[in-house]
Design a protein with these regions (language model features):
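Conserved, single-site charged/polar hotspot
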Residues: 2-553
Length: 553
């Protein structure tokens, strides 16, 4: 019998020791203590993408680029060029430029020309600044006042001077940014051409790399800072996808994992990003980004997170993505399965033949150990209320429907004023659980029981009172001081909690796994790599029937 399908049979000699060990523990017990599409690429020649830096630089009152030399330019039809260089010994501070302005009717082809005119107007004792509108397109704005009346007072001082004509009064448009350097300032107005400029580092770090320094984090590529319709500033990193992956792979998978597992992560992260955003670098004020640097997309911490081991994995798989049926596909992944991955239909309700549940028995060193989460009655009620699911006083917590892999698909909460049924991913979100592979234990339950079949028929026994044969062949008594027992079956793992709460006001959630369970298990991929599988084989296993190919071909 093949535990992992035909893929494993091809490696039978190399893996025999591992498979035999798994079979030995078919009913042996291990003791464990407490402890998500957009559009695909249409232009394979252009590999810059846009990543929203929402984790640290989204919706801020100000963002500072600490570099002393930066270049300003616009990306038009996926082609960027630096139009102007700026220097500042104190770096560059970007803030929203809300307020009322008048604009000179005349346009200017350079910052220098616009600044000369602005300087003349400033001699009248008013605020006048050059404004970046687009490539070779500058204006001069006067004002920046909190009220229209204040702006009109300024206009009264300048309207008959120097022969300049002005626009009508312009209120805040949600797209203006003020940039302050050590001895000068200028404005950016993204609304006129529906685009913001992008900035690149012109000074080099100690390793000779041009890296933009935003304080807590540094980034390769370019940075775009805009308001995007809000009274705050947000940074977007425009970066080559391979350089982006340098900052993703070590954040999504431990850099000390096997090199083949790191390659799996690199290919999957590349596929995920390309399916989410395609190749697109141009500014778009109506949608700053589709991909961000958090778990909502993929965790990305930029240049400072890079590791030589994960960089090598990215380089070794350069340009490769996951394909199914001749098309690039989204590659979902997660930390730990707890014995088996899950069908995508059981998690998000959609169908995808390559995202089927598969046994994950090489996940022998899980990144996330089996876990226990305890809630009091009042804590459960607060969680429900915070998600607008109030049921009054909680009476019972009942896993109502289980998937074939042992995950809770429907969880019923029975309360004094009604019932609420939570489904799949909502369960994790509401109760902050690592996964949906769990058992609920209440006062009075005898959780560590299992039914064994013998010569005298079925018998219910307590695991804590049993002796077990380990994978090494030794016989030991169960350790009763640990929180739950993990039993390895032919194609999954099962958990048996040891203890029940002493109070009727408590519920224990005993579980395994970490993440949604769809696609590739990172811990399992590492186990398969250690057992001798290559990254292409691992990908084809977790994404059933999928292959690795060159993006854009």
């Amino acid at each position: 019998m093949s535990l992992l399908g035909g893929c494993l049979n091809r490696k039978s000699r190399k893996k025999r020791g591992m498979v035999l060990a798994l079979l030995l523990i078919f009913c042996s017990v291990f003791l464990c203590g407490e402890k998500e599409a957009g559009y695909a690429s249409q232009n394979a020649g252009m590999t810059d993408i846009r990543v929203g830096l929402s984790a640290l630089y989204g919706g801020k009152t100000q963002i500072k680029i600490s570099n002393t030399k930066i270049g300003l330019g616009y990306c038009i039809k996926d082609s960027y060029q630096t139009d102007l260089e700026f220097a500042s010994s104190t770096g560059f501070v970007f803030t929203p430029a809300a307020g009322y302005y008048y604009s000179l009717a005349k346009t200017y082809s350079s910052y220098a020309n616009a600044e000369r005119v602005a300087a003349v107007i400033r001699n009248l004792g008013v605020s006048a600044l050059p404004v970046a509108i687009y490539r070779n397109y500058w204006r001069v704005y006067v004002g920046g006042t909190a009220t229209a009346g204040q702006a009109e007072q300024i206009y009264a001082k300048i309207k008959d001077r120097f022969g300049y004509s002005y626009s009508v009064l312009m209120p805040d448009n949600g797209h203006r940014v003020l940039v302050r350097a050590d001895r000068y300032e200028f404005l950016i107005d993204g609304e006129k051409k529906k685009a913001y400029p992008q900035f690149k580092a012109l000074d080099l770090d100690g390793k000779g790399n041009a890296v933009l320094d935003l304080g807590e984090r540094r980034y390769r590529g370019r940075i775009e800072i805009g308001c995007f319709g809000k009274n705050s500033v947000t940074a977007v990193n425009i970066i080559n996808i391979e350089s982006y992956l340098y900052g993703v792979v070590p954040c999504e998978m431990q850099a000390n994992y096997h090199s083949e597992a790191l390659k799996v992560q690199a290919v999957c992260a590349r596929s995920f990003a390309l399916m989410k955003v395609g190749y697109s670098a141009d500014s778009n004020i109506s949608r700053a980004y589709y991909l961000e640097d958090t778990t909502k997309s993929q965790v990305y911490r930029g240049y400072g997170a890079e590791d030589s081991r994960t960089n090598r994995a990215v380089d070794a798989t350069r340009g490769e993505a996951v394909y199914y049926g001749g098309k690039m596909v989204p590659t979902y992944y997660f930390s730990t399965s707890g014995g088996s991955t899950e069908n995508v239909s059981e998690v998000w309700g959609m169908g995808a033949d390559y995202l089927k549940a598969v046994p994950d028995l090489y996940e022998t060193e899980p990144e996330k150990k089996p876990w226990l989460v305890s809630y009091t009655r009042s804590e459960l009620e607060k969680k429900l209320s915070a998600n607008k699911l109030s049921v009054g006083t909680v009476r019972a917590v009942i896993p109502q429907v289980m998937t074939a892999t042992g995950r809770v698909y429907l969880l019923k909460i029975r309360g004094s004023s009604g019932n609420s049924i939570l489904q799949a991913g909502t369960i994790r979100e509401v109760f902050s659980l690592p996964s949906t592979k769990f058992k609920v234990v209440k006062q009075g339950d005898v959780p560590d029981t299992v039914t064994a079949l013998g010569g005298w028929g079925a018998e219910t026994i307590r695991i804590g009172e049993s002796y077990m044969l380990s994978a090494q062949g030794s016989v030991t008594k169960a350790d009763t001081e640990l929180s739950q027992y993990i039993v390895a079956g032919a194609d999954n793992l099962m958990n048996y909690p040891q203890n029940a709460p002493e109070s009727a006001d408590n519920w224990y959630f005993y579980g395994m796994g970490y993440g949604h369970g769809v696609g590739m298990s990172q811990s399992g991929a590492n186990g398969m790599a250690k057992a001798g599988y290559g990254y292409r084989e691992i990908i084809s296993y977790y994404y059933s029937g999928a292959t690795v190919g060159r993006a854009g071909t």
